């Protein structure tokens, strides 16, 4: 529990908006205030721990951070309000800070998990809101990221110009 408490308190002190830090040294220095995958993963972490410990006080402790983080993710990081947050995710590819499938998937799972937390804590309105968004996001992931031509999911949604820019940057870095 101490690692979760530390992660939560450092994130709050560093960001103050629900964003979860990405990289912290053993001396407490924050090297990366957070990409966009850590925040939804934190919500899912809290739900998974609760599934093991059944401690409602544990949920109550971190629920405000989860709500704040989901708000940050779905407002500040989703300017076009399509439920796909924009920014760097788990795939740390230089210049790839667009709508990415890993972040969309983590966000969908976090919405499901945060809805379950809200239900346990009897926050019905928030639970229903998160459930509705999770259902829409699941459908959008399966339609907008799916590439019929490649019979596979795309890594990110972007324009041809964005994709070419990534390739050009990769070639320059390889030199």
Language-model features, listed with the residues they occupy:
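Asp-box/WD-like beta-propeller blade repeats and closely related beta-sheet repeat scaffolds
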Residues: 63, 91-94
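Aromatic-rich carbohydrate-recognition surfaces in CAZymes
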Residues: 1-80, 84, 100-108, 114
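Residues at the C-termini of beta-strands that transition into short coil/loop
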Residues: 24, 88-91
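Catalytic cores of carbohydrate-active enzymes
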Residues: 20, 78-87, 95-102, 106-175
């Amino acid at each position: 529990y101490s690692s979760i408490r530390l992660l939560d308190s450092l994130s709050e002190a560093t960001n103050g908006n629900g964003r979860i830090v990405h990289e912290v040294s053993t001396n407490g220095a924050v090297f990366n205030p957070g990409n966009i995958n850590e925040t939804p993963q934190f919500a899912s972490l809290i739900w998974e721990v609760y599934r093991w410990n059944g401690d409602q006080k544990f949920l109550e402790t971190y629920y405000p951070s989860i709500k704040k983080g989901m708000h940050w993710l779905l407002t500040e990081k989703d300017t076009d309000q399509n439920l796909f947050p924009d920014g760097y995710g788990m795939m740390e590819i230089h210049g790839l800070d667009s709508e990415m499938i890993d972040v969309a998937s983590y966000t969908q799972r976090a919405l499901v998990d945060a809805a379950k937390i809200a239900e346990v804590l009897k926050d019905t309105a928030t639970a229903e809101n998160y459930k509705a968004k999770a259902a829409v996001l699941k459908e959008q992931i399966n339609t907008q990221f799916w590439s019929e031509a490649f019979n596979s999911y795309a890594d990110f949604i972007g324009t041809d110009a964005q994709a070419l820019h990534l390739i050009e940057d990769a070639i320059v870095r390889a030199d």
